[in-house]
Amino acid sequence: MKKRRTIIVCICILAAAAFTLALALPKKSYAAIGRNARKHYAEYETRHSDPQDEPAKDEDDDSSEFWFPVPEGYLNKKTDEKKYVSSINPDDTPEQWDALEDAVQMREVSQIPADILETVSTDELVLYCMNYNLFIDFMLFNTMQDGMENVRSDYNGIRELMTRPDAAESLIRLYKLYDLDEQKARDSVGCIRLCYLEAMLCMPEILNSLTAKQANELAAACAQKISKIVNDENSPYSVSTTMYLAAVSQYAASEEFAEIVNASSGAKRYIEEGILVPDEISDDTLGRIVSYFQEL
């Protein structure tokens, strides 16, 4: 009995010593965390910017589509995915599309009919928006915000979506279900379409309606996608809009994160303009941002 008590006392002493040592060891500074994050991001950027040979495409075995493939579980019913595509489009009706005189006519035939717009559910309205013929136009501007404002002015689907009180809920659910590999295999423009979905989530009406829970769900979904992209050397996806979505959603919903960002002119510029200049953000600020997301 005395021997057992002695062993227990020794274990307690060792545990106390280990705990004291852990407290005495210097914690990794925010600046060190920031430097490490900057290093990894630079390595990713270098790898991502290097031109890589595209795998040869077998035209006889191309299963990808021009419309948006609906992820399983998004709708609670089976549906014809092509019902959300405009009747006149560059893939199904190329002759009619090519006969259109200018961009004005292209936009006109790409609108959602009024009777559908007034009655369609928000979940399905999102799918109409994902299939907008000219959605890629959002990439033709200096900033993503300017691009999406242009799409808003040109397309009644986005304008209607931004009035729906449950738009954020529908968009977040779709984003969480967006499997990178599956969508890339099924969608001929899957990588660009993901950026478009992320750009919709970054619109002011969506960000301003987010609850803290929704913002955290978005951050978790973004982190999952970023991890998959950066760890796959051959990934065709970019993390740019994904990183931005994670940042602006937290900035809108978290006072703590907003305080970190507002203390850095470079970080604030990134949030407000979508322009990332790494040298404008200090290692300390970057470390605080990384630590914030790690603790979510």
Language-model regions, residue ranges each:
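Sec-dependent signal peptide cleavage junction
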Residues: 21-37
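Low-complexity intrinsically disordered segments
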Residues: 3-5, 17, 43
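Ser/Thr/Gly/Pro-rich low-complexity, disordered linker/stalk segments of secreted
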Residues: 47-59
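Bacterial N-terminal signal peptides
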Residues: 12-20
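Short extracytoplasmic/periplasmic juxtamembrane "stem" segments immediately C-terminal to an N-terminal membrane anchor
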Residues: 40-46
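Non-catalytic all-alpha helical scaffold/repeat segments
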Residues: 38-40, 66, 70-296
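N-terminal Sec-pathway targeting helices
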Residues: 1-13
